[in-house]
């Protein structure tokens, strides 16, 4: 009996000593085992993978389900892993010191002669700089990048300034993508309206041109800014925009232009995101809201702009757009303004076309054109003008658009023709129709005034 107990203890001691021997595995192997064990125990805790097919072991996984609300552990794991990933990507970017060092190296390796005031660099020197600049710069020093920037230099060189601006632009794009991705709660590569609102709200203090805005106006400013992104980048009203689309359009450039403390007055007035522009749009809304209930009735909206939008068109606005007890809120008003102020843009034409296409047929026929133009004729009578024949106007519209089907005008026809803004103005706005009808007189007046200015000089 005693011998059995002694043998048992000897066996336990041998096992203990064996476990104390140094582990010969690498850190990567240990982490791999840790990850494997975590997956195994987590799967067991969730109830296991019942009825899993053998093919799952051979087919790569291509769909990753988002964790449900009750899967707190998976949500936390996903958030942490995304944060670590974005931090790593951020560290891979060139910082200011590294960019300055790159500029110094490029300047040191410039190859004469200069072209005008621009310093140039040859491909051989370009590769030398790439070797000295460090690993972070490797992706910029490729034959493809050099060929992109190669123009008509007789010595086969590229401009140092153009190359450096290319690097700066790439770094900025990656920084901005990482910054936007931090607000991508779902981690799917797109931003919802609330995500973009948070991004712009936190961006406001970094934009000197917005220093004069009262904090009480921030919510209206954010709404004004966000609506432009969603009006043009989310035409199907999915409620989300791809981060790639945000980076590809010029809106973010316009927004970040407000970092310039010396931005000209003209630039501010033409920039939708500037303080003067946002205050102008909001001020117009308040001026239209005569009963001060925070909403616009059809009668109040009829005074928009020059007050010459037809009642038939306004009826369609209130039928087709989201309203509350027959009145329009600020967000819906912003869509209306963006459509009318950007009538050349496809998204704006889509908005107006939807209102003109009363029967949702996907095209405008002679009946639809006549329905809207009759309101223009009625307004002309009210103002003591001789009504223009619809047949003449109809023929002019079809001549301008040149639709594929000679009896139907589709949205694509309007976009392709480049005359969508003119056609929509003729049908919905008396002032727009008058401008079109008297275009030759207006051009002649402009020519005369320009000639007079030249004579004065």
Swiss-Prot record:
Annotated GO biological processes are: B cell homeostasis; cortical cytoskeleton organization; microtubule cytoskeleton organization; positive regulation of B cell differentiation; regulation of dephosphorylation; T cell homeostasis
Query: What does the UniProt keyword field contain?
Result: Calcium, Cytoplasm, Metal-binding, Nucleus, Repeat
Q: Name one GO molecular function term.
A: metal ion binding
| GO cellular component terms, semicolon-separated | centrosome; cytoplasm; nucleus
The cross-references to InterPro entries, in alphabetical order and at most eight, read: EF-hand-dom_pair, EF-hand_13, EF_Hand_1_Ca_BS, PPP2R3C
Q: What is its main location?
A: nucleus
* UniProt xrefs under Pfam families: EF-hand_13 (PF17958)
Gene3D superfamilies linked to this entry: 1.10.238.220, EF-hand (1.10.238.10)
Name of the protein in its database record: Serine/threonine-protein phosphatase 2A regulatory subunit B'' subunit gamma
* Amino-acid positions noted as binding Ca(2+) in the UniProt annotation, renumbered to this chain: 289, 291, 293, 295, 300
Briefly state the protein's biological role. Answer: Possible role in the regulation of cell death.
């Amino acid at each position: 009996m005693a011998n059995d107990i002694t043998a048992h203890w000897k066996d336990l001691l041998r096992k203990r000593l064996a476990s104390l021997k140094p582990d010969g595995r690498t850190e990567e192997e240990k982490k791999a085992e840790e990850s494997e064990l975590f997956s195994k125990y987590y799967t067991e805790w969730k109830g296991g993978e019942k009825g899993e097919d053998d093919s799952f072991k051979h087919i790569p996984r291509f769909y990753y389900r988002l964790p449900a609300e009750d899967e707190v552990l998976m949500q936390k794991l996903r958030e942490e892993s995304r944060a670590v990933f974005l931090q790593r990507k951020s560290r891979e970017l060139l910082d200011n010191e590294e960019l300055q060092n790159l500029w110094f190296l490029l300047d040191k390796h410039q190859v004469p002669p200069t072209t005008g005031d621009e310093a140039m660099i040859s491909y051989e020197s370009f590769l030398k700089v790439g070797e000295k600049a460090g690993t972070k710069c490797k992706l910029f020093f490729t034959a493809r990048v050099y060929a992109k920037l190669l123009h008509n230099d007789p010595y086969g060189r590229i401009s140092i300034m153009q190359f450096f601006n290319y690097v700066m632009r790439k770094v900025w794009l990656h920084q901005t993508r990482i910054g936007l991705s931090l607000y991508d709660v779902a981690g799917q590569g797109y931003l919802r309206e609330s995500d973009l609102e948070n991004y712009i709200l936190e961006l406001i203090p970094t934009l000197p041109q917005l220093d004069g805005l009262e904090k009480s106006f921030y919510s209206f400013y954010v709404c004004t800014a966000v609506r432009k992104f969603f009006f043009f980048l989310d035409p199907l009203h999915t409620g989300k925009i791809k981060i790639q689309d945000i980076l590809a359009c010029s809106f973010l450039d316009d927004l970040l232009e407000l970092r310039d403390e010396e931005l000209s007055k003209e630039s501010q007035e033409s920039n939708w995101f500037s303080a003067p522009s946002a205050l102008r749009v909001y001020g117009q809304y308040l001026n239209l809201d005569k009963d001060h209930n925070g909403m616009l009735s059809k009668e109040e909206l009829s005074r928009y702009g020059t007050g010459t939008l037809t009642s038939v068109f306004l009826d369609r606005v209130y039928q087709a757009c989201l309203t509350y007890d027959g009145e329009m809120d600020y967000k819906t008003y912003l869509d209306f303004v963006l459509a009318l102020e950007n009538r050349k843009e496809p998204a704006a034409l889509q908005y107006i076309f939807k209102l003109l296409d009363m029967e949702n047929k996907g095209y405008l026929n002679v009946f639809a054109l006549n329905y809207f133009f009759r309101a223009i004729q009625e307004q002309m009578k009210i103002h003591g003008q001789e009504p223009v024949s619809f047949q003449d106007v109809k023929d002019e519209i079809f001549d301008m658009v040149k639709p594929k089907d000679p009896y139907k005008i589709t949205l694509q026809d309007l976009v392709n023709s480049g005359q969508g803004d003119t056609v929509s103005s003729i049908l919905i706005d008396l002032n727009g129709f008058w401008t079109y009808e008297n275009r030759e007189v207006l051009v002649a007046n402009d020519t005369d005034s320009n000639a007079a200015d030249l004579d004065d000089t």
